[in-house]
UniProtKB/Swiss-Prot annotation:
GO cellular component terms listed in the entry, alphabetical order: HslUV protease complex
Keyword Ribosomal protein annotated: no
General function of this protein: ATP-dependent specificity component of the Clp protease. It directs the protease to specific substrates. Can perform chaperone functions in the absence of ClpP.
Keyword Lyase: no
Subunit structure: Component of the ClpX-ClpP complex. Forms a hexameric ring that, in the presence of ATP, binds to fourteen ClpP subunits assembled into a disk-like structure with a central cavity, resembling the structure of eukaryotic proteasomes.
Protein name, UniProt field: ATP-dependent Clp protease ATP-binding subunit ClpX
GO biological process, one term: proteolysis involved in protein catabolic process
Limits of the ClpX-type ZB domain: 1-50
Protein family membership: Belongs to the ClpX chaperone family.
Keywords: ATP-binding, Chaperone, Metal-binding, Nucleotide-binding, Zinc
Highest taxon of the lineage: Bacteria
Residue sites binding Zn(2+) per the record: 8, 11, 31, 34
């Protein structure tokens, strides 16, 4: 306990005039009032720093241009996302008398079409914290699994528990279609009615609430202190394949359209039938109306074609083949994939139904032995991968 003669080294108040005096090294002291002021200054500084970072948000065209560098195809989805993200952060920064709702996003598209990569790249462009959650692991209270608040734990962890930064982060929830409740319209859903409970629990944090977040995760550490996190300005992007949704849309179009088959054929020619999705279709699929209402921006991603996959292998800044070329260049060896090799890799990804996600696994399998041998190779100038996905070694000319 501080003695009566002690004074604060910052404000010079006596220990008699403040609730608490904290003794430091070399006779230095600080009173509890100065500690509170210091904490307020730190919070204000953090707010200003985060606001500065977000204030430099690029315009929609600039966002799409950067997305184009990393993601092949999906032009319409990239436009929709660029506008939604720009409006979301503009809404945070520029206070208005008009109540502008949050532009949470729903991405619908097959496995490997780029949903996760789009969300991750957006967070990178905007320099905001980012977290990914898998909806299939989430359960409502009373069931075995993760609490929905664990989604927020990951976001806090990814920004070193800086609450101000976390408040303006992006959370991507994958496989959101798997928590749809069972319905007669969508018999493919196997999850029981607890899926609706998870939707209700997620609804609160998605629409904006002061959430009590267990910093070490919920159920394994029941006695920890909670962190309060306001989710009002966190952007939520939900994604899923929604297998069976196409049939629901077809049924709706069939009921409302004369010449049903002609109308369906027209949509098939123009593109993805899923692009005709409406909120009622998602409700019939098994999402509750309130949940659908909190995801006002819906974007549909197309299945990637063989040509798209070939471009993904070679064109983006972080293309997997570019990465291997650079690794072999460091060994003084060139690397070339023939057009036939690229096409065979793309065909295999389509056959596996893994889309862009499966390309890396296929290329890594081809390259494993090459990367094992490369550091020991002598006089090899170039390695060419042909349509049989086998390496051909080109040696340096003697002399």
């Amino acid at each position: 306990m501080a003695s009566k003669k002690e004074y604060c080294s910052f404000c010079n108040k006596s220990s008699k005039d403040v609730p608490l005096m904290i003794a430091g090294p070399n006779g230095m002291n600080i009173c509890s009032e100065c500690v509170e002021k210091a904490m307020d200054l730190i919070k204000q500084h953090d707010k200003e720093e985060v606001t500065k970072e977000v204030r430099s948000i690029p315009k929609p065209k600039e966002i799409k241009k950067i997305l184009d560098e990393f993601i092949i195809g999906q032009d319409e989805a990239k436009k929709i996302l660029s506008v939604a993200v720009y409006n979301h952060y503009k809404r945070i920064l520029r206070k208005s008398d008009t109540d502008i709702e949050k532009s949470n996003i729903l991405l619908i598209g097959p496995t490997g079409s780029g949903k996760t990569l789009l969300a991750k790249t957006l967070a990178k462009i905007l320099n905001v914290p980012f977290a990914i959650a898998d909806a299939t692991t989430l359960t409502e209270a009373g069931y075995v699994g993760e609490d929905v608040e664990n989604v927020l734990v990951r976001l806090l962890q990814n920004c070193d528990y800086n609450i101000e930064k976390a408040k303006k982060g992006i959370i991507y929830i994958d496989e959101i279609d798997k928590i749809a409740k069972k319905s007669g319209h969508n018999p493919s859903i196997t999850r029981d009615v607890s899926g609706e409970g998870v939707q209700q629990a997620l609804l609160k944090i998605i629409e904006g609430t002061i959430a009590n977040v267990p910093p070490q995760g919920g159920r394994k550490h029941p006695h920890q202190e909670f962190i309060q996190l306001d989710t009002t300005n966190i952007l939520f992007i939900c994604g899923g394949a929604f297998v069976g949704l196409e049939d629901i849309i077809k049924r709706r179009l069939g009921k409302s359209t004369v010449g049903f088959e002609t109308e369906i054929s027209k949509y098939k020619e123009e593109g993805n039938i899923l692009s005709q999705v409406e909120p009622d279709d998602l409700i019939n699929f098994g999402l509750i109306p309130e949940f659908v209402g909190r995801l006002p921006v819906i974007s549909v991603l197309n299945e990637l074609t063989e040509e798209d996959l070939i471009r993904i292998l070679t064109e983006p800044k972080n293309a997997v083949i570019k990465q291997y070329k650079e690794l072999l260049r460091m060994e003084g060896i060139g690397l070339e994939f023939t057009e036939g090799a690229l096409r065979e890799i793309a065909k295999e990804a389509i056959k596996r139904k893994t889309g862009a996600r499966g390309l890396r696994a296929i290329v890594e399998k081809i390259m494993t032995d090459i990367m094992y041998e490369a550091p020991s190779l002598v006089n090899v100038e170039k390695i060419v991968i042909d349509e049989n996905k086998k390496p051909v070694y080109m040696y340096k000319k003697a002399g």
